[in-house]
């Protein structure tokens, strides 16, 4: 039986392929993701890059899409930490009281974790479907290195590991 969750996937637009891989991987585990994040088509991305869509318009759209989601998943990959929109989305998720789960993309490193996630993240997991599902569901709040080994959270908030992981 498939489980369906409404989430917002915060990511750098260059990582759109990882968004598809994440939803496909979880789908193979009967976990259906309804992603409300923005995935800019080339024409829309060009309008954004040219400044034809204001930051206020983007923020309003992101707030509406994020409000619909129960959890915000942050894809942590190369250069994620340099993306101001990812930090904005994490801060907004915190203001909205959303659960914030970081997922290391394959090849992601500790240096790629955004500063806002270090302050507000609830869980940080490797690219492993069971760990990702447990973190989204809130069954546990693990903090893992990119290779899946345990690590200390960056914040002082209390966190619980999953079943001894």
Where are these regions (language model features)?
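Short, structured coil segments at secondary-structure junctions
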Residues: 29, 96, 118-121
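Conserved N-terminal substructure of TIR/SEFIR domains
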Residues: 1-68, 153-165
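C-terminal interaction surface of TIR/SEFIR-family domains
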Residues: 2-7, 21, 52-56, 107-165
């Amino acid at each position: 039986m498939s489980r369906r969750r409404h989430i917002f996937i915060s990511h750098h637009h260059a990582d759109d392929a990882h968004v598809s891989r994440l939803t496909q991987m979880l789908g193979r585990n009967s976990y259906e993701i309804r992603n409300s994040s923005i995935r800019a088509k080339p024409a829309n991305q060009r309008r954004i890059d040219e400044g034809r869509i204001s930051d206020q318009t983007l923020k309003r759209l992101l707030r509406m899409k994020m409000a619909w989601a129960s959890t915000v998943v942050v894809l942590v990959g190369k250069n994620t930490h340099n993306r101001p929109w990812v930090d904005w989305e994490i801060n907004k998720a915190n203001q909205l009281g959303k659960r914030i789960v970081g997922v290391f993309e394959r090849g992601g490193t500790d240096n790629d974790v955004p500063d806002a996630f270090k302050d507000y993240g609830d869980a940080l997991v490797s690219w492993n479907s069971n760990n990702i599902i447990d973190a989204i569901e809130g069954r546990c709040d693990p903090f893992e290195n990119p290779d899946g080994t345990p690590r200390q959270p960056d914040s002082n908030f209390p966190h619980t590991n999953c079943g001894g992981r």
